[in-house]
Design a protein with these regions (language model features):
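HhH-family (HhH-GPD) DNA N-glycosylase catalytic core used in base-excision repair
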Residues: 1-332
Length: 332
């Protein structure tokens, strides 16, 4: 690969509806004008402050799937499946931007990579408006004041996250990572990582749709859920892309075997990008509600959460932050 090119990818321009086209206009003059070929690029991804990096990068690091993601030298690194080739990205928070180092297999994928990274880190959120709404609740106000600007860790691949959400049902973070790593080793697409220990792209639904269920070290009911999900994703019966109607996607997910409210809402929050998704039955949310004197039964907490709309996914980040868990701490 050639020398690193430094680009400032403006947050406001990239947040508009034609984000990819705007990004192309910004970056093409800085790259060689060849139609294809690999490239190494360094970008600054600005955001509207404040941004609390602890839960954002802590969550990504604590749940990293070996071979696909890692925390290395102060950066979250992962592989990316892009239109023309695979890529590796390293992301590190700074005071007013996120450093983004891309190793692209094909330079034509630069705009797509920028868009995915901004989506993953929720960089186009408006923390001022969100925090103002949440801080109006006396129980949440101290949490917002302590660490303003919490973002929702999202995903670069909605299908990947949906599969991982199923693998994470009713198991520890470590167990979920182990199950996902086995899928990656068996079915992922190998990729070269010039700077670290990443080895694969996460397998796409088509690669998983034909797998032998006996190879999954999961309870039989969970195997059925995984296979039903990947079949629906591979066939297009379920579309988790950015243009998907949220309630339609929720309804299709609910129709799958093994999909309860927690799984549907976690996918809505992380994969579909619904800012109002609310997994009210999540154990961490329930424990936080109890500690704050909020109602803790699902129905009562759902009623209380109406005051946080349309930003309940962000309220969840503040509630989760009350717990002592690695997802709340950015690694050194």
């Amino acid at each position: 690969m050639g020398p690193v090119t430094l680009i400032d990818a403006g947050a406001l321009a990239l947040a508009r509806a034609q984000r990819a086209e705007t990004a192309r206009m910004l970056v093409e003059p800085a790259l060689p004008q060849t139609p294809a070929g690999s490239a190494r690029v360094r970008l600054r991804l600005p955001f509207r402050p404040p941004l609390c990096p602890d839960n954002l990068f802590g969550h990504l690091a604590a749940t990293a799937v070996p071979g696909v993601e890692e925390w290395r030298d102060g950066s979250y690194r992962r592989t990316l499946r892009l239109p023309h080739a695979g890529a590796v990205v390293a992301l590190a928070p700074r005071a007013d931007h996120v450093d983004c180092h891309l190793a692209l297999g094909d330079r034509r994928d630069l705009a797509s990579a920028i868009e995915l990274c901004r989506r993953l880190l929720d960089l186009d959120a408006d923390p001022i408006a969100i925090d103002a709404r949440l801080a109006a609740d006396p129980q949440l106000a101290p949490l917002v004041a302590r660490s303003p600007g919490r973002r929702v860790p999202r995903s670069v691949d909605p299908a990947e996250f949906a599969v991982r959400a199923v693998l994470g049902q009713q198991v520890s973070t470590a167990a979920a990572r182990t199950h996902a790593a086995r899928l990656v080793t068996a079915h992922g697409e190998p990729i070269d990582d010039p700077d670290g220990g990443l080895t694969h792209l996460f397998p796409d639904p088509a690669a998983l749709a034909g797998l032998d269920p006996e190879t999954l070290a999961l309870p039989r009911s969970r195997r059925r859920t995984v296979l039903a999900l990947v079949a629906a994703l591979a066939s297009g019966e379920i579309d988790l892309g950015p243009a998907t109607a949220l309630e339609d996607a929720r309804g299709r997910l609910r129709a799958l075997p093994g999909f309860g409210p927690w799984t549907v809402e976690i996918i809505a929050m992380r994969a579909l990008g619904d800012p109002d998704a609310f997994p009210g039955g999540d154990l961490g949310v329930v424990r936080a509600a109890q500690s704050l004197g909020l109602p803790s039964t699902p129905a009562a907490l759902a009623a209380a959460s109406q005051a946080w709309r349309p930003w309940r996914a962000y309220a969840v980040q503040y509630l989760w932050a009350t717990g002592d868990h690695p997802v709340n701490r950015m690694p050194a």
